C-alpha cells in the first residue's frame, strides 16, 4: 500500500519550536500587550523573550512583536521588540484608517519585517480588520512569512456593525487579501461581544476577555507541542493540521467531576458546540488536532468518548491527531483543546467562525455553560493629512466614498494587479 506523500520537516532543537506572535496595528498590538502582561503575571507559557522571568524549559519559545505605523503606540507597548513601519509615509502618526497607507508602509519596510520573522517555525498574526495598519499591513507580513516557509495563522476581528458598512467592507476585503498568504485564519466578529457578556460588564473587562482569545489560542497550541504527554503532539503534527488552508477554529472545554463519561462529554461539548456558531459547518473539517489534559485519574472511556465526539464532525479524509497529557496536580478536572482547519474558503460574505472557550465547574448532572468571547479591540489612530505623496494623501474631511474610489484606483481590491504594477 502506498501512503500519500507529506512534506519533510527539519528536526527541531531541544528547546522546541520557535513561535512568534506579531501584533499588527492598534488592535493587534493591544491583543499582544494583553497576552504579555498576563504571561508576566501568571508565569505561564514558554520562554518569554522580553522583560520577564519566564524561563520554563518544559515549554517552547514564544517571542512577541508589535508592528505599527503609530510611533506613540509603539512607545507605550509592553512588547519589547517593536517594528515601526512607514516612517516616510506616515511620519509616525498612524495610517489614519486608510488600508492603502498601511499596505504601503509595510511594503516600504519589508526588509525589517523579514528580519523580524526569520527563524520562526510558526507565526501568529493578530490584527483588527477595517482600519488602516492592521487591514493593509497584515497581508504584507503574511506574504513575507509565506515566502520564508513559515507556518502562519492569522487571528483577526471584524468591526462592530455600528462602525458602518464601509469599514466592514474594508475589513472583508482585507480578510480576503490576507487569506491568500496564511495557512489558517480565525475570524472573530466584535459584534459578538454584546451577546456574550452581561449588559453591566465594564468596558475594560469586556476587552480584556476578548483579548484572552489570542492568548488561549497561542498557549493552547504551544502547550500541545511542548508539554510532555502520554501521547505526544509534535510540531510536525501541528503543521500538518494547520497547513490545511481555509477557515479555522480553536476551541477549549473544561469540566470538573468524577472520572467517567460525564465530564468527558461535557468538556468535548464545550469545545465543539455553541449556539452562536450554528451557521458554521464543522462537518467537513479537513484537519483536526486534539489535546486532552487531565490528572492521573483519566480513564480509557473518557479518551474514547472525546475521540468519538471529535470524529463525528470530521470528513472521511481528515487528518486527525490526538494527544494526551497527564498532569498529577490536576484533580477531578479534564481539559480539551481542539483545532479544526479546512472549514471552507474564506470570503467576506461567508459565515464566520468564532474562537470559543468553555469552562464547566458544575456537577456533571447540571448544565455547563459556554463562554465565547470575540477577540481584539482596535485602537483608532488619529486621522491626519498625508503629505508624503499625492497618491496616499487623505484630508480629514475626505468622504469615505471618495476613499473607496481611491482604493479601487490603487488596486487595493485586487492583490494580483497590485503585484503587477
UniProtKB/Swiss-Prot annotation:
Record keywords: Cell cycle, Cell division, Cytoplasm, GTP-binding, Nucleotide-binding, Septation
Assembly: Homodimer. Polymerizes to form a dynamic ring structure in a strictly GTP-dependent manner. Interacts directly with several other division proteins.
Subcellular location, principal: cytoplasm
Pfam families linked: FtsZ_C, Tubulin
Main function: Essential cell division protein that forms a contractile ring structure (Z ring) at the future cell division site. The regulation of the ring assembly controls the timing and the location of cell division. One of the functions of the FtsZ ring is to recruit other cell division proteins to the septum to produce a new cell wall between the dividing cells. Binds GTP and shows GTPase activity.
Compartments (UniProt record): Cytoplasm
Highest taxon in the source lineage: Bacteria
GO molecular function (one): GTPase activity
GO biological process: cell division; division septum assembly; FtsZ-dependent cytokinesis; protein polymerization
Binding-site residues for GTP, renumbered to this chain: 26-30, 132-134, 163, 167, 211
UniProt feature coiled coil, ranges: none
InterPro entries in the record: Cell_div_FtsZ, Cell_div_FtsZ_CS, FtsZ/CetZ, FtsZ_C, Tub_FtsZ_C, Tubulin/FtsZ_2-layer-sand-dom, Tubulin/FtsZ_GTPase_sf, Tubulin_FtsZ_GTPase
Recorded family membership: Belongs to the FtsZ family.
Stored PANTHER family: CELL DIVISION PROTEIN FTSZ-RELATED, MITOCHONDRIAL DIVISION PROTEIN FSZA
Highest classification ranks of the organism: Bacteria, Pseudomonadati, Pseudomonadota, Gammaproteobacteria, Pasteurellales
Protein name from the UniProt record: Cell division protein FtsZ
Amino acid at each position: 500500500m502506498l501512503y500519500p506523500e507529506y512534506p519533510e520537516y527539519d528536526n527541531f532543537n531541544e528547546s522546541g519550536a520557535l513561535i512568534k506572535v506579531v501584533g499588527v496595528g492598534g488592535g493587534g498590538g493591544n491583543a499582544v500587550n494583553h497576552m504579555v502582561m498576563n504571561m508576566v503575571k501568571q508565569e505561564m507559557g514558554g520562554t518569554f523573550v522580553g522583560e520577564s522571568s519566564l524561563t520554563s524549559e518544559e515549554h517552547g519559545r514564544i517571542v512577541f512583536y508589535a508592528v505599527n505605523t503609530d510611533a506613540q503606540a509603539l512607545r507605550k507597548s509592553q512588547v519589547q521588540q517593536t517594528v515601526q513601519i512607514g516612517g516616510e509615509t506616515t511620519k509616525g502618526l498612524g495610517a489614519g484608517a486608510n488600508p492603502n497607507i498601511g499596505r504601503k508602509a509595510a511594503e516600504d519596510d519589508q526588509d525589517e519585517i523579514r528580519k523580524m520573522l526569520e527563524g520562526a517555525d510558526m507565526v501568529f498574526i493578530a490584527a483588527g480588520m477595517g482600519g488602516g495598519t492592521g487591514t493593509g499591513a497584515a497581508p504584507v507580513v503574511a506574504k513575507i512569512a509565506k515566502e520564508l516557509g513559515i507556518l502562519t495563522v492569522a487571528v483577526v476581528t471584524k468591526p462592530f456593525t455600528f462602525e458602518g458598512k464601509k469599514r466592514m467592507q474594508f475589513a472583508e476585503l482585507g480578510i480576503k487579501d490576507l487569506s491568500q498568504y496564511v495557512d489558517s485564519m480565525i475570524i472573530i466578529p466584535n459584534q459578538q461581544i454584546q451577546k456574550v457578556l452581561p449588559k453591566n460588564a465594564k468596558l475594560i473587562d469586556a476587552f480584556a476577555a476578548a483579548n484572552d482569545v489570542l492568548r488561549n489560542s497561542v498557549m493552547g497550541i504551544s502547550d500541545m507541542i511542548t508539554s510532555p504527554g502520554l501521547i505526544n503532539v509534535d510540531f510536525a503534527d501541528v503543521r500538518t493540521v494547520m497547513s490545511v488552508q481555509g477557515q479555522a477554529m480553536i476551541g477549549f472545554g473544561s469540566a470538573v467531576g468524577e472520572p467517567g463519561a460525564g465530564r468527558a462529554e461535557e468538556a468535548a461539548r464545550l469545545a465543539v458546540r455553541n449556539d452562536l456558531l450554528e451557521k458554521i459547518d464543522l462537518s467537513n473539517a479537513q484537519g483536526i488536532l486534539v489535546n486532552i489534559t487531565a490528572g492521573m485519574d483519566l480513564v480509557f472511556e473518557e479518551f474514547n468518548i472525546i475521540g468519538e465526539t471529535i470524529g463525528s464532525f470530521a470528513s472521511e479524509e481528515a487528518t486527525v491527531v490526538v494527544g494526551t497529557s497527564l498532569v498529577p496536580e490536576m484533580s477531578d478536572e479534564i481539559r480539551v483543546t481542539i483545532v479544526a482547519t479546512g472549514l471552507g474558503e474564506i470570503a467576506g460574505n461567508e459565515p464566520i467562525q468564532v474562537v470559543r472557550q468553555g469552562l464547566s465547574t458544575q456537577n456533571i448532572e447540571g448544565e455547563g455553560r459556554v463562554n465565547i468571547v470575540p477577540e481584539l479591540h482596535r485602537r483608532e489612530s488619529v486621522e491626519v493629512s498625508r503629505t508624503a505623496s499625492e497618491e496616499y494623501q487623505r484630508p480629514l474631511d475626505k468622504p469615505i466614498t471618495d476613499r473607496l474610489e481611491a482604493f479601487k484606483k490603487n488596486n487595493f481590491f485586487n492583490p494580483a494587479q497590485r503585484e503587477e504594477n
